[in-house]
């Protein structure tokens, strides 16, 4: 519905399939043109979006010539230029290498912190995104849904990133959500093991 278009932005997992223009700048402006925003507002928002997502140097580049991570950031930027309150991302890191995935997740984090946008991510690679999440939803096979802090949900779910599985096996509380968390939790164990040699 039209009223949701102003509030919710959606980015699919294949950004190139969703692009409707040829260049970065045109793509960032397209959604605003469809909403009938004045030219001066569009120009200002395009500049802000280019800066916020770190793609200003790509302004005149053809979308098809961008890397996967750059395409994903432009797709997110094109949606964000319309100023939605909620951003829905379908597997935003699925086709990206680890470095590009980190760049996209850093851009998403900036959106949350700088603009106060609510971001909903559907992702199979939990290890990439769980450390960024404030809340998690786990959809059980029987149709029920568990909701809570990521550590609460992952403590009992049948699906968890390897670092969480390690935390379960080691009996760590709280469970680590990132490798950094696991290193902190393992520090006392490393010290004990170092004392034995």
Residue ranges and their predicted role:
Residues 40-58:
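Conserved ABC ATPase "signature" region
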Residues 62-66, 70:
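Conserved ABC ATPase signature
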Residues 79-80:
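ABC ATPase C-loop
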Residues 83:
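Conserved catalytic motifs of ABC-family nucleotide-binding domains
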Residues 87-90:
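Catalytic Walker B motif of ABC-type/P-loop ATPase nucleotide-binding domains
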Residues 98-100:
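Helix N-cap at the start of a conserved alpha-helix in ABC-type nucleotide-binding domains
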Residues 123-124:
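H-loop/switch region of ABC-family ATPase nucleotide-binding domains
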Residues 139-176:
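Conserved beta-strand-loop-alpha-helix hinge in the C-terminal portion
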């Amino acid at each position: 519905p039209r009223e949701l278009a102003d509030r919710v932005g959606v980015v699919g997992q294949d950004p190139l399939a969703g692009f409707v223009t040829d260049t970065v700048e045109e793509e960032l402006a397209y959604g605003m043109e469809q909403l009938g925003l004045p030219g001066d507002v569009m120009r200002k928002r395009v500049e802000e979006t280019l800066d916020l997502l770190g793609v200003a140097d790509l302004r005149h580049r053809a979308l098809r010539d961008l890397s996967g991570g750059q395409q994903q950031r432009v797709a997110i930027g094109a949606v964000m230029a319309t100023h939605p309150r909620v951003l829905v991302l379908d597997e935003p890191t699925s086709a990206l290498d680890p470095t590009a995935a980190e760049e996209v997740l850093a851009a998403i984090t900036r959106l949350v912190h700088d603009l106060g946008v609510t971001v909903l991510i559907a992702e199979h690679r939990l290890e990439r995104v769980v450390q960024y999440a404030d809340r998690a939803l786990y959809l059980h096979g029987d149709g029920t849904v568990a909701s809570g802090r990521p550590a609460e949900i992952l403590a009992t779910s049948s699906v968890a990133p390897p670092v969480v599985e390690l935390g379960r096996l080691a009996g760590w509380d709280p469970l680590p959500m990132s490798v950094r968390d696991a290193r902190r939790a393992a520090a006392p164990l490393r010290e004990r093991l170092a004392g034995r040699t």
